[in-house]
Curated annotation (Swiss-Prot):
Recorded metabolic or biological pathway in which this protein acts: Glycan biosynthesis; glycogen biosynthesis
Record bears the keyword Nucleotidyltransferase: yes
Residues marked Could play a key role in the communication between the regulatory and the substrate sites (site): 74, 113
TM segment ranges: none
Record InterPro entries: ADP-Glc_PPase, ADP_Glu_pyroP_CS, GlgC_bac, GlmU/GlgC-like_hexapep, NTP_transferase_dom, Nucleotide-diphossugar_trans, Trimer_LpxA-like_sf
CDD domains: ADP_Glucose_PP, LbH_G1P_AT_C
Sites where the protein binds alpha-D-glucose 1-phosphate: 114, 179, 194-195, 212
Keywords, ordered alphabetically: Allosteric enzyme, ATP-binding, Carbohydrate metabolism, Glycogen biosynthesis, Glycogen metabolism, Nucleotide-binding, Nucleotidyltransferase, Transferase
Name of this protein: Glucose-1-phosphate adenylyltransferase
Family: Belongs to the bacterial/plant glucose-1-phosphate adenylyltransferase family.
Organism: Salmonella typhimurium (strain LT2 / SGSC1412 / ATCC 700720)
Assembly with partners or alone: Homotetramer.
Length: 431
């Protein structure tokens, strides 16, 4: 382990990102989000009133000084590719800056699609090698968080690691969805189990497990060796969490990086923010958290901005209808191009170009772009997918049995409405 002086750290914070390439794994379907990902990959799902989920990983790279980025795509990639082409074309080719889109190459052993997360990188190795990076930062494209990857790179170098895994404590009942690790006093990973049925608890805290965040830093040459060996292993599932990280752990070459060391937050006393919005309830809740008085995730931090594709839209408008009812909102996010006419919106998130007509009550709802809500509707605890037209007088979120019959209702009572569901409902009513 190398002990670095403050001046050395400042220098490395500038140099290491320039020697690195980031690979964002963005091919996941996100089946737990149900119909919300039927026509888009999970990283392309809308979030926070104006963003896409992948904007967080991309913005973290940009803010950390990593300007060479590969985005590995697969499932329903058109929306994702279009978003990146329109919103992330700010890099300078003359300065060797880029965002490369890397689809499934469909050339390894006759496979059409990626066999696992590690295979997604393996299939693109010939392209990745051309980047001539010393370090490879591998990221999930479907998490909400702010992280300075340069700090993680410094930790990687300081510990003399060949592989570094970002980690944070999670409630033990949720740890079955993550890779869970045990570490020694030097943060060396001494045990790693992917999605265990009975997650081991952290020493001194039986209520939590130490979970992998799916964020890795590798020495580039070491990663290439690992992937070449894994590709030849017919018994492997070709996955970082299931195969690569356990192998490195057995070899004693993997170290943990505690997320608080690199988490970017305005309030240093706050809990580090990282969300895997993989379920409908988690997605709904993370969106509504941003509309609270003091959100856990600060989206107004000018020192760490989250970028996205910006459309030229007029400001949101709140108008009085002909009967004299005022358009009002409280504790909500309302994006450009929205019009609220004679209705009340409370604790909700409205994406661009949402139109709410008179006499509506919108409470704890997430309305994606171009949603049109007819007069006298009541929407509560729901997510309305893009371009849905909610008929006049429709009530959602008040009758569990009716919601489950017409739409998708989660066990927690969150209702998802899509255009296809509304179309089927209309056909049924016309019979």
């Amino acid at each position: 382990m190398v002990s670095l002086e403050k001046n050395d750290r400042v220098m490395l914070a500038r140099q290491l990102p320039l020697k690195s390439v980031a690979l964002i794994l963005a091919g996941g379907r996100g089946t737990r989000l149900k119909d919300l990902t039927n026509k888009r990959a999970k990283p392309a799902v809308h979030f926070g009133g104006k963003f896409r989920i992948i904007d967080f990983a991309l913005s973290n790279c940009l803010n950390s000084g990593i300007r060479r980025i590969g985005v590995i795509t697969q499932y329903q990639s058109h929306t994702l590719v279009q978003h990146i082409q329109r919103g992330w074309s700010l890099f300078s080719e003359e300065m060797n800056e880029f965002v490369d889109l890397l689809p499934a190459q469909q050339r390894m052993k006759g496979e059409n699609w990626y066999r696992g997360t590690a295979d997604a990188v393996t299939q693109n190795l010939d392209i990745i090698r051309r980047y001539k990076a010393e370090y490879v930062v591998i990221l999930a494209g479907d998490h909400i968080y702010k992280q300075d990857y340069s700090r993680m790179l410094i930790d990687h170098v300081e510990k003399g690691a060949r592989c570094t895994v970002a980690c944070m404590p999670v409630p033990i009942k949720e740890a079955t969805a993550f890779g869970v690790m045990a570490v020694d006093e030097s943060d060396k990973i001494i045990d790693f189990v992917e999605k265990p049925a009975n997650p081991p608890a952290m020493p001194g805290d039986a209520s939590k497990s130490l979970a992998s965040m799916g964020i890795y830093v590798f020495d580039a040459d070491y990663l290439y060796e690992l992937l070449a060996a894994d590709d030849k292993d017919d018994a492997s599932s070709h996955d970082f969490g299931k195969d690569i990280i356990p192998k490195i752990t057995r070899e004693g070459m993997a170290y943990a990086h505690p997320f608080p060391l690199s988490c970017v937050q305005s309030d240093p006393q706050a809990e580090p923010y990282w969300r895997d919005v993989g379920t409908l309830e988690a997605y709904w809740k993370a969106n509504l958290d941003l509309a609270s008085v003091t959100p856990e995730l600060d989206m107004y931090d000018q020192n760490w901005p989250i970028r996205t594709h910006m459309e030229s839209l007029p400001p949101a408008k709140f108008v009085q209808d002909r009967s004299g009812s005022h358009g009002m909102t409280l504790n909500s996010l309302v994006s450009g191009g929205c019009i609220i006419s004679g209705s009340v919106v409370v604790q909700s998130v409205l994406f661009p170009r949402v139109r709410i007509n008179s006499f509506c009550n919108i409470d704890s709802a997430v309305l994606l772009p171009e949603v049109w809500v007819g007069r006298s509707c009541r929407l509560r605890r729901c997510v309305i997918d893009r371009a849905c037209i909610i008929p006049e007088g429709m009530v959602i979120g008040e009758n569990a049995e009716e919601d489950a019959r017409r739409f998708y209702r989660s066990e927690e009572g969150i209702v998802l409405v899509t255009r296809e569901m509304l179309r089927k409902l209309q056909v049924k009513q016309e019979r």
